[in-house]
């Protein structure tokens, strides 16, 4: 996060924004605004903000606002290694659960939305998203497919929306960010309907994120429904490049050399796929022995590295 002092001539506008935020919060009520609320500022053709009221120890309060000004990026432009991108877009991944894991600000939503767009473009079908809030505008037709977006203001509304749209039998359902056990459980239940359910989830590393989600869906115990439906998880990390603003020379092809953002960062990914119903991975998960996934993650990475080498050899020099 970068902090900056506002110019003096912006204080009048900040006062108007503060008053507008107070008015919206009062109109909606404390309970309805508990998880934040949307506002457009300035009201005429302004920017979409997500605001949350935070009480202070002295009895006053502040509003924390997050601006959503991202434009969708093409899947080929986010810096993901070609073999991993190709595996994610395989037609065989048409049901189950797929998770994009990472720390806050790691690019989970950007990656997921780019993937959803490209999947709709290539494989077609109908995709529904349920987000709180909608961060990237995806609504519309994409050659062979359609994407429709819906916004939910609270976890309770998110749960109901997932159940509601699950009955519509989409090809893909993107639940956005899973922030509580009940939403994780609803994701696992929705996956039984036979379509692909995607979401993002906070996690410091791949195995930790998978285990935490599995236990969240089972309210402390490993969810059998999640284990049966699990298809893939991708851990995403954005690493700072060197102080000169240039991407570091890294031999790992799963760390992109494409610098992005300010300050410049590069994309690092680690993944795990589980396609077969009888895959031993599921046995380790059911037992709660998630540490055993390490060897399979390494094996799959070796396979992707081999594919990367073959793809490089096939390129014209």
Q: Where are the regions a protein language model picked out?
A:
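Short, flexible helix-loop junctions that flank or precede catalytic/ligand sites
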Residues: 1-317
């Amino acid at each position: 996060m970068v902090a900056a002092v506002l110019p003096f001539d912006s204080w009048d506008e900040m006062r108007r924004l503060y008053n507008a935020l107070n008015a919206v919060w009062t109109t909606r009520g404390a309970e309805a605004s508990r998880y934040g609320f949307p506002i457009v500022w300035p009201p005429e053709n302004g920017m979409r903000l997500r605001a949350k009221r935070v009480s202070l120890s002295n009895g006053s309060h502040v509003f924390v606002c997050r601006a959503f000004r991202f434009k969708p990026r093409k899947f080929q432009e986010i810096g993901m290694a070609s073999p991993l991108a190709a595996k994610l877009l395989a037609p065989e991944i048409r049901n189950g659960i797929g998770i994009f894991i990472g720390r806050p600000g790691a690019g989970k939503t950007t990656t997921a939305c780019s993937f959803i767009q490209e999947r709709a473009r290539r494989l077609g079908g109908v995709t529904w998203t349920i987000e709180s809030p909608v961060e990237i505008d995806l609504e519309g037709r994409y050659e062979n497919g359609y994407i429709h977006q819906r916004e939910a203001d609270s976890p309770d509304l998110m749960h109901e929306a997932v159940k509601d749209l699950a009955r519509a039998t989409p090809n893909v359902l993107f639940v956005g960010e899973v922030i509580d056990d009940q939403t994780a459980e609803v994701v696992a239940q929705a996956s039984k309907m036979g379509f692909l359910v995607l979401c993002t989830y906070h996690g410091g590393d791949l195995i930790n994120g998978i285990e935490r989600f599995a236990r969240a869906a089972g309210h402390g115990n490993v969810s059998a429904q999640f284990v049966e439906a699990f298809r893939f998880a991708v851990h995403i990390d954005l690493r700072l490049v060197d102080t000169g603003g240039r991407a570091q020379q890294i031999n790992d092809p799963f760390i992109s050399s494409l610098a992005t953002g300010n300050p410049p960062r590069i994309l690092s990914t680690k993944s795990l796929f589980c396609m077969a119903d009888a895959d031993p991975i599921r046995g380790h998960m059911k037992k709660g022995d998630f540490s055993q996934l390490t060897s399979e993650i390494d094996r799959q990475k070796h396979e992707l590295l081999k594919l990367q080498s073959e793809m490089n050899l096939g390129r014209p020099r």
